[in-house]
């Protein structure tokens, strides 16, 4: 047993080259153009740079957003106990919950991540269970006491130093095990902060110093990010954190004052001091239009990142740069477990990458070591595969190939410093921009022959700030064709990735716009053909046979059908006809067919036949246009060759592809619905359906995955097995999901369940392979609840409180304004509620007037003040009464529930009640006194 005692990062200059950009100078032919400005039309003119925004990233934030990829490593007792949160270890010894009997393999994990393009590794040195994966002198709840002979944090640090991998430290503030957590007296009973015997804030700070001040930890002693997870289990709120003290300690050892550091250590979960923010979910995805700015209030130590389930969207006009960080998992859980060790598919990881990095955020992917201290080979291989797909996708920038011309609608001062060619020079510090007074500009990339691509990358010069609030990407199939919109939206930021079905074009145009007074600036632009693994997947579930409508071997047409292409269609292909009796046939092998196409306000009906037998009339009319959707689904068919025939009846019919179940009658399983709603402390019953055949037995698991809902909101270990026996087409699953009671004010949260681990291998998991579950917050803060609190708070009276009124009044005024603002966001409403509730709790009830807290006479015209009698500075009982003493009494009829009872004047003396007061002005004051008397006179 050890005796308890109480008592960095590398600064990098701006302009780091993007990880996977092509190396070497751009090979761009800057030929003459009919319109626009090319490099050849620019010269050195000494034009000043445009002004930077007030809010820009510091060097560490800039590097992180350019690095793009970081990894998380969750490892600890939970790894050995098949759980996510160590809430129930109780008094078990460290050796009972942590059983690593061989050396931790840090080298393989770090090397694999580095080779796959990851630039940072964040380590859970201490999770919520309080167990430390290093031998800490401040606790005996660590690896040393568990019998592990090494120092896992030091071993990972050594590997990161070898491979030059940035490091982040995860040190959970919430500590379930530590005795000093919360407020307890000498006997261990709950008490007030003032009477707390042990100080958890000191304990946590000591551990920060122990790690951050020791050169054996970190990448050569440096940490670039400290993660203070905001998770707090229900009932764990009786501990206020001394964040300011902790922040000072972090920067003392790892901040910009340390030699070699150009910026402070980044902080996650640090309230107003946050420099890396949670994206709002644990799915690893960001909002489509994400801003890298939040609004912080240092006086109140609050942050508002425009949170609206399941995203923190940021603000265009935020006052602080906060890197949007998307934390997600390569498996279903954060910690490894025998039932949650299957890695996500490359398609799932691709979606995560494009929806995080491609939405102006960083991707933080958790890679969990197993109970042998190594990373499973399938997980390592998936990391390698992911890294290879990133490299393969972005290796060749078609906008840099020989024979390319890049034109700009405007170039700032026609200066070579801001020429269009800067966007393909692989240098983040250079950029293209426009003259002052312009708030929109475009770049047009032209090729001498058509190029096939499916990814367009746009990077804003964020060293000057994030300002672009509109973008559009267009293409021309040929020089004389019309412009077709590939994608449009709002934000660009560090990177905007537009991924579509493959298209061929001779020109691509990128148009960006900003607010008044600001010019657009782009540092890099790329046009790419995605690797096979990173291609935009069609709507077909994995395992189905798919046929595009341009496959003229399987699809046959008569009369007038009109082929067209576009990124909005499955595989970029569509064929339509509005000619009555126009016919198509599709021949396929399988047991069920889905015809995919377009629904539109201008589309109509068609008759469908299977094997020359009429099946039904389909109606493809819809109020809004959708592409890539199911327009026909057959019944289950006998395994074999079949022919589908479609005959146009009225208006237009658009067809894109056919999907077929063709696995010998084993079939496809899926959840009945794609969305469910649950209450807290609830269980969910779902139906799993089987189509396309019922031959043999199919088993699968229903696996829960965190989203904006985290482990305290639902049972992460609940993963029931689904079994559909031979001939069975439907099964009901009880307890498919189980929610918990979370007494924290969280708002509605969401997680998902998905069908995984199917058996046999040729079984198909269908369109509804996963479902989103919304948990309704029993304690949710909404506008009505805020309004109720405002009304209740408005009834409080200033004269009843000696401290905290000014803060309370300010919070009340702000809450009232927010409640009346119809455009107030969910986050703004929540913050206003919490601020008012906290200010209300902080009010100190007045006991009496004193020399330092005097009653103030109202001297301004039209004002008044109430003096409660029971707030007497002194009460002198001079009459010697035994029954009717002059003292404070309590009755319901009295204002504030109290009054001065029995003031008497007798031969022996006169009772006196005195008040400390202050009269700022000399004059006559009018007093109305309320009293009662026991004397009839």
Predicted features along the sequence, with ranges:
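Short boundary segments that mark the start of a structured unit
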Residues: 665-781
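Sec-dependent signal peptide cleavage junction
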Residues: 19-35
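Aromatic, loop-rich ligand-recognition surfaces of beta-strand-rich domains
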Residues: 393, 425-536, 583-587, 596, ...
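Glycan-recognition surfaces in beta-rich domains, encompassing non-catalytic CBMs
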Residues: 532-665, 858-914, 920, 933
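Mature catalytic domains of secreted/periplasmic carbohydrate-active enzymes
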Residues: 36-427, 431-437, 444, 457-459, ...
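Edge beta-strands of jelly-roll/beta-sandwich modules across compartments, strongly enriched
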Residues: 517-530, 651-661, 698-700, 749-751
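Short, surface-exposed beta-strand/strand-loop-strand elements in extracellular ectodomains
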Residues: 466-478, 601-614, 937
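Beta-rich interaction/scaffold domains
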Residues: 779-858
